[in-house]
A protein has these predicted regions:
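Active-site environment of divalent metal-dependent phosphoester hydrolases
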Residues: 30-31, 52-57, 77-80, 95-98, ...
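Zn-dependent metallo-beta-lactamase
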Residues: 1-21, 27-31, 98, 105, ...
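Active-site-proximal loop/helix segments of hydrolase catalytic cores
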Residues: 116-183
Length: 232
């Protein structure tokens, strides 16, 4: 059964019993809440939700170190190729892409998608969420997003684990994230994208209480950076 590790912020690691390793939104080197060395991770696949620096993170280096495939939206993929990433497979909302050990389906996300290069902020297409089928389980990585009504349709995908941002300010906050948990109907909900920087300070236990009111059948698992969850 798959194991999900929260690296911190919105960066996650998925591993299965066959040795397949996937990294999602690998913001690691400059991530103030993690001690993980990005060189210690050996993914064959990197999944990206959008182009913001705190999600693209170490993608270019990790792809080179591991000869990893990067799966992302089209415009972000085009830009990554200009940065030297050799193996990019890009898609768009509604599309499903297979990778070693699983599949990733792009969903809508209400947010923006741009990269700050130190001088300019350049837009790279649209943001996305990801429905990831891996190790016999179905994960919903919402990415950075506001609440939206069509999350109810995502619930039709049979989500086992929903990973939802709760930080507010740049994404939905705890109240709307609890509604998202209700809409998606996942068995397990894991909060992310909080307590990395001052504007997104939140109490995950308060979020758990709100989910208990909205979706009492869901189990909220609060991880600390570096902690793993057995999705079996």
């Amino acid at each position: 059964m798959p194991k999900l590790t929260w690296i911190g912020h919105s960066a996650f690691l998925l591993e299965d019993d066959e040795g397949n390793v996937v990294v999602i939104d690998p913001f690691i080197e400059d991530n103030p809440v993690t001690s993980v060395d990005p060189k210690s991770l050996k993914p064959s696949t990197i999944l990206l939700t959008h182009a913001h620096n705190d999600h693209v993170g170490d993608t270019v280096d990790m792809a080179e170190w591991n000869d990893a495939r990067v799966i992302c939206t089209v415009e972000l993929g085009d830009w990554l190729e200009t940065q030297g990433v050799r193996d990019v497979v890009s898609g768009n909302h509604g599309g499903t892409i297979a990778f070693t050990g699983g599949t990733a389906k792009f969903t809508p996300a209400w947010h923006s998608s741009s990269y700050w290069d130190g001088q300019n902020r350049v837009a790279h297409g649209i943001p996305a969420g990801l429905i990831v089928r891996f190790g016999g389980r179905t994960f919903y990585f919402a990415g950075d997003t506001a609440l939206f009504g069509d999350m109810r349709l995502i619930g039709d995908e049979g989500i086992d684990v929903a990973i939802l941002p709760i930080g507010d300010h740049f994404t939905m906050g705890p109240d709307d994230a609890a509604r998202a948990a209700e809409f998606v109907g996942a068995k397990t909900v894991i909060p992310c994208h909080y307590n990395t920087f001052p504007p997104i300070r939140q109490d995950p236990k308060a979020f758990r209480a709100k989910v208990g009111e909205r979706a009492p059948e869901a189990r909220v698992v609060i991880l600390t950076p570096g902690e793993s969850f057995d999705a079996g």
